[in-house]
């Protein structure tokens, strides 16, 4: 697998209206069990995890530099999930992608089922 998160019994959840997501725009979502960002690039919609792969800190989108930033260790990712800058001994992993679709003007992400309490 290419690092894709493929939930076995997830469900499609609405994260944005297609009309709200302009070309190149980034929209954050939080469904409880999963949080991330959707982006439209060249007409296609992509969704990446909004949680840093290093220690699970919540990322925020910095529009001025078009990057997802981690407040914990100054790591930043491209909206496609690739590491742009980091100050760690080893680069963190790229952000996982979610299955995403646009249907009837609605953008939906395949959210994993709520996790069992550990």
Cite the ranges covered by each PLM segment.
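Iron-sulfur (Fe-S) cluster-binding segments and ferredoxin-like electron-carrier domains
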Residues: 59-64, 76-82
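Extracellular/periplasmic metallocenter environments
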Residues: 71, 79-80, 101
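Short cysteine/histidine-rich metal-coordination sites, predominantly Zn2+-binding motifs
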Residues: 66-74, 84-95
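N-terminal pre-ligand scaffold of iron-sulfur
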Residues: 1-65, 94-118
């Amino acid at each position: 697998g290419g690092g894709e998160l493929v939930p076995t019994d997830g469900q499609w959840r609405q994260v944005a209206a297609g009309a709200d997501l302009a070309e190149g725009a980034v929209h954050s979502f939080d469904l409880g069990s999963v949080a991330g960002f959707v982006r439209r690039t060249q007409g296609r919609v992509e969704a990446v995890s909004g949680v840093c792969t290093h220690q699970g800190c919540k990322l925020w989108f910095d529009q001025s530099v078009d990057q997802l930033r981690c407040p914990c260790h100054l790591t930043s990712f491209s909206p496609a999930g690739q590491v742009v800058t980091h100050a760690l001994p080893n680069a963190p992993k790229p952000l996982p992608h979610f299955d995403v679709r646009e249907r009837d003007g609605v953008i939906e992400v395949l959210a994993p089922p709520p996790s069992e309490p550990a």
